[in-house]
A protein has these predicted regions:
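Short glycine-enriched loops at secondary-structure junctions
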Residues: 82-87, 107-110, 136
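Short helix-loop-beta junction
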Residues: 93-103
Length: 238
């Protein structure tokens, strides 16, 4: 009986959090709300936000109020690794406000020590509940890797994407950026390789995932529609 009451109480609490974060007038995240969010709830919030974005139903926010309310601290529920592409702002495509998301951006959404350190800070120290590795269609960095481009410091960055090019074995001919299907296949593989790299190269994040403290998932943002599709096979979420 007591267990049933507790489950009902937890369900009501979860529904309350989801309602608060998806209401027409979004509230600024507090430590209490952040603590109550589970990894699966965090994913649902992002999915709901993207649906609003695609439907052009942006949440009404008082950004100046959020500036004031986050001036002494922040409690983001998610960390999103995405490309630097100007069309892929995580806060916009997931319809979130100030203090909601740690946005980590680098061309080609690749993984290195600095990226991992940023994620460890976001999750272990700041309390975020989910990591999203977000690729996007028509990615210039992926195209550069497909074409084996070389230019200054960009050469070393593209070298981190080239293993994804090699892993794409479906395409036999026209393995260049002119083949859009090839580019999109490589972009998807690159997201999945980044998920694997996070798990392998960060003992802190791997342990938090195993302990179900945080979740991780990969996804792809379609620049033509704005829709984000998540890869269920990459998900480690409770």
């Amino acid at each position: 009986m007591c267990q049933g009451i507790k489950l009902l109480s937890d369900l009501c609490k979860n529904l309350t959090i989801i309602f608060i974060l998806n209401s027409k007038r979004m509230k600024t995240l507090t430590k209490e709300i952040q603590d109550a969010i589970t990894p699966s709830m965090a994913l649902q919030i992002l999915q709901d936000g993207n649906k609003r974005f695609v439907s052009n139903l942006k949440t009404n926010r008082n950004l100046l109020q959020q500036v004031n309310e986050t001036s002494d601290g922040q409690h983001p529920f998610a960390v999103v690794l995405s490309c630097i592409d100007s069309r892929t702002s995580a806060e916009l495509i997931f319809d979130q406000g100030l203090g909601d998301i740690f946005s980590v951006r680098i061309a080609g959404n690749i993984i290195n020590e600095d990226i991992l350190g940023s994620m460890e800070f976001a999750c272990k120290l700041a309390g975020s509940k989910i990591i999203v590795v977000l690729g996007h269609s028509k990615c210039g960095a992926v195209k550069g890797a497909c074409d084996h481009a070389e230019m200054g410091n960009l050469t070393a960055l593209l070298a981190k994407i080239k293993p994804s090019v090699d892993d794409e074995v479906e395409t036999k001919d026209n393995r260049t950026s002119k083949n859009s299907d090839f580019v999109e296949n490589v972009a998807a593989i690159n997201v999945k390789r980044s998920i694997k790299a996070i798990m392998e190269k960060s003992a802190i994040l791997e342990q938090m995932i195993k302990n179900r403290e945080i979740g991780i998932i990969g996804g792809m943002h379609d620049l033509s529609t704005g829709k984000v599709s998540f890869y269920s096979e990459t998900a480690f979420i409770s």
